[in-house]
Amino acid sequence: MLIDHLNRQQLEREAQGLQRQRRIAESPCAPRQWVSQDGQPAREMLAFCSNDYLGLANHPALVEALAEGARQFGAGSGASHLISGHSRAHAALEGDLAAWLAPSIPNAAALYFCTGYLANLALLTALGDASATIFADKLNHASLIDGALLAKATMQRYAHRNLTVLASQLESCTTPIKLIVTDAVFSMDGDLADLPALLALAERFDAWLIVDDAHGFGVLGDQGRGSLSHFGLRSERLIYMGTLGKAAGLGGAFVAAHPSIIDWLVQAARPYIYTTAAPPAVAHALRESLRLISSAEGEQRRAHLQQLIIQLRTQLSALIGAHPTLGWRLADSSTAIQPLIVGDNAAALALMAALDAQGLWVPAIRPPTVPVGTARLRITLSATHSAADVQRLVDGLACAARELP
């Protein structure tokens, strides 16, 4: 019965163009990767799909730091943080991360998690008890949505970036604890939340602002310190989640907040308490990643990435203008996430296939990840791309625009 039920659902997904497939990366994360799929021989692709925004995932210094960490601390942690898995490497990283966020969160403390998904589940389930209401942007990441659904708090969602509706919801809220929850950079659209206005609402209505900065950490702000730095924000009402497997090039995530909040997560956050700690070698290497991000090299990489973003948007805007009947639309994004909105699922898959045939790896994103009718190619740029790489992508899209029906 179960297998028949699942098979029927799979057939329905295939008919709607929603079936997901995995590819196998046969080489390190980089703009040029050897990739195989469905048992076919691997081929080299020019990839515009990773979240390795600064190109650190295969940086020699991080590769060496990871190896050094393994030699010093071994391969695994062996237990959860509250048993015997909390190593000196984890503690040192948390100290570095707290200092990293101190300009934005007074007296900040930090807690390291295995993944950003776990960090968000931990935050919302531990803080969102029955005395709380969670106010969530409708385009928040799935982990924030799932965390809010698992929490005992009431959840109210507001239309994307609609602060008028949010203000009305806050004004009518009667629970003593109010948690405003938002992505900083929205993962499928690339646009920025209005964090200054959200913080102003938090202060006006005695609420707390939880910011998921998965796609801003390392890329935005002074020395790559993230979206809070980008907007020049500073407040004890800020609760910050940053991921360490995107711009930081490794893995894991962290929460930075008032020490009382971090202490409560240690006591009450089940995804933290009941998870084996990440390998200490990763924590050790992440300290080197923070050094790189804040260094002159990190600044050069961010500047180059910004030039690529401008180049891509300028050239794609011209291409879209030359082919108005295709109905393509470039999302309003100033970040390394540059979605090309195509419309229906079949069109997005056809465009992805046309680029694939040219050796370009750009994923098609479809519902339920994005709203129905907004299927898109999610183009992401890295500091290790070149201007010639971006030109090749634009040329590939131009070729597809001429050939697709």
UniProtKB/Swiss-Prot annotation:
N6-(pyridoxal phosphate)lysine found at: 246
NCBIfam families listed in its UniProt record: bioF (TIGR00858)
Binding-site residues for pyridoxal 5'-phosphate, renumbered to this chain: 116-117, 187, 215, 243
Keyword terms, alphabetized: Biotin biosynthesis, Pyridoxal phosphate, Transferase
Reactions it catalyzes: 6-carboxyhexanoyl-[ACP] + L-alanine + H(+) = (8S)-8-amino-7-oxononanoate + holo-[ACP] + CO2
Subunit and partners: Homodimer.
InterPro entries: Aminotransferase_I/II_large, AON_synthase_class-II, AONS_Archaea/Proteobacteria, AONS_Proteobacteria, PyrdxlP-dep_Trfase, PyrdxlP-dep_Trfase_major, PyrdxlP-dep_Trfase_small
Segments crossing the lipid bilayer: none
Lineage, highest ranks first: Bacteria, Pseudomonadati, Pseudomonadota, Betaproteobacteria, Burkholderiales
GO BP: any one term: biotin biosynthetic process
Biological or metabolic pathway of the protein: Cofactor biosynthesis; biotin biosynthesis
Cofactors, names only: pyridoxal 5'-phosphate
GO MF, one example: pyridoxal phosphate binding
Assigned EC number: 2.3.1.47
Keyword Nucleus: no
Entries under SUPFAM superfamilies matching the protein: PLP-dependent transferases
Protein's name in the database: 8-amino-7-oxononanoate synthase 2
Residues noted as binding substrate in the record, renumbered to the chain: 20, 141, 369
Record function comment: Catalyzes the decarboxylative condensation of pimeloyl-[acyl-carrier protein] and L-alanine to produce 8-amino-7-oxononanoate (AON), [acyl-carrier protein], and carbon dioxide.
Family listed: Belongs to the class-II pyridoxal-phosphate-dependent aminotransferase family. BioF subfamily.
